[in-house]
Amino acid sequence: MRCKRCNGSNFERDEDTGNSYCGGCGTLREYDNYEAQLGGIRGPQGTYIRVGTIGRGSVLDYKDKKIYEANNLIEETTERLNLGNKTEVIKSMISKLTDGEFGQGEWFPILIGACCYAVVREEGKGVLSMEEVAYEVGCDLHQLGPMIKRVVDHLDLELREFDLVGLFTKTVTNSPRLTDVDRDKKEKIIKQGTFLMNCALKWFLSTGRRPMPLVVAVLAFVVQVNGVKVKIDDLAKDASVSLTTCKTRYKELSEKLVKVAEEVGLPWAKDVTVKNVLKHSGTLFALMEAKSMKKRKQGTGKELVRTDGFCVEDLVMDCLSKESMYCYDDDARQDTMSRYFDVEGERQLSLCNYDDNISENQLSTKYNEFEDRVCGGTLAKRSQGSSQSMWQRRSVFGMVSTENWWKGKSELSKRLLLKDLLEKDVGLEALPPSYIKGCVAVERRREKIKAAKLRINAIQHPSDNVSEGALSLELEHSKKKRKKGSEIDWEDLVIQTLVLHNVNEEEIEKGHYKTLLDLHVFNSGEV
């Protein structure tokens, strides 16, 4: 190799540095003394960092450092979720899932949260919602849910029933809105909420849905029954759930209670609506609690034995005979609710042998007699003696006091397994709302299919004997229908198209229009 500067070939080597230089011009020869530092007898070593280590000054290699940081993250997450005693179990699960490699990145905290949730659900001794886990690990529910499913499937875990009652109790205990409520009233809220939550479970209001909105709805209802001024907006905000969903659950719960009033045969059931069902909650809760405590006598057919001494006729008579409890006194600072049932009064409800189904005429007669006494008789005169104590007819059944009608002795006031809960009778047997909506949708599609067939038949086989008057009348009628907004919509057109392509009606009723159009109309399923 010649010198790049003078093109000479006389090179000499420096004794001190060992570098070659040109004897003519003194230019150093490039790459003459180069040694690769990627291997050799001195071990794996790079130019700036040692190969296999995490950086300058570290004594741990990459894998050890990754496992060390992963363990620290697991410990921090379990401490925030109050699962410090389950740290080693969660570490073992993650090690098994990752073949001992653990991990780094945005997916790893989600995996930790999924394992925490799976451990709690598998043992069934604690309460941990997915919303709480997602908040602590900093992810969305749609990211956490699939990860939990993968963990459960990979480890072949069997999760127990979700403890909605425990979640309700935890929410009440930790709610900042109830810190000023006295201990006795908070205990009553927990018991009544547990009872109503079990009823909601029996009515399938939680089936296939997120649990937290239902918990907020039940809590909002119960605190109003007990006279605590807390808005559902604040409870939803504290629980970090959608306010719209919470209000929907609240409405569904109110609708079920209205149906309970109809099923148990209250004489004033026609006056109970979704808007005022809260005012009648004392009556409904007392009836539902008493009804849930009755047991069927074995070996005697349909004969019933009541363990709580409950009888509908005695209950109504006892309610209507206590005149003093329907007088509203401002000075007494009573709750703005009437006391329908006084189970701790002088005359307790006695066991009776009347038929379980009392005629509605008897109950209505007693109710009308009581209402007449209120309007122009005995009870109305009570308001004439004091200027501050008066009778308000609008609030006859608009006041409920939770002090007397609530017993809290029913098994529904504590957590029950779903199979035991379904055997209880609370006055109403309901189907899941999603199932009801599905049946309604199928019936609607069935009617649309019939209408589509009629339209197709009218076009394919028009009547030859239609007079001009009948035709003009039909056109006028169609114009009126269009004005009312009842014209054919997109669903009618899709169903009509599928009917023209001879698609099975049962498949159309399922509502998978896009798939059916691809298969039968656009032929996208052909290979």
From Swiss-Prot:
Keywords: Metal-binding, Nucleus, Transcription, Transcription regulation, Zinc, Zinc-finger
Cross-referenced InterPro entries: BRF2-like_C (IPR054078), Cyclin-like_sf (IPR036915), PTF2 (IPR053340), Znf_TFIIB (IPR013137)
Tissues showing expression: Expressed in shoot apical meristems, root tips, primordia of lateral roots, inflorescences, developing pollen grains and embryos.
A single GO molecular function term of this UniProt record: TFIIB-class transcription factor binding
KO phenotype (gene knockout): Embryonic lethality and aborted seed when homozygous.
Main location, first listed in the record: nucleus
Subcellular location: Nucleus
Cited Pfam families: BRF2-like_C_cyclin_rpt (PF21886), Zn_Ribbon_TF (PF08271)
Keyword Metal-binding set for record: yes
Stored SUPFAM superfamilies: Cyclin-like
Keyword Nucleus tagged: yes
Positions of TFIIB-type zinc fingers: 1-30
Cited function: Plant-specific TFIIB-related protein that plays important roles in pollen germination and embryogenesis, possibly by regulating gene expression through interaction with TBP2 and the subunits of RNA polymerases. Binds double-stranded DNA in vitro.
PANTHER family the UniProt entry points to: PLANT-SPECIFIC TFIIB-RELATED PROTEIN PTF2
Protein name: Plant-specific TFIIB-related protein PTF2
Organism of origin: Arabidopsis thaliana (Mouse-ear cress)
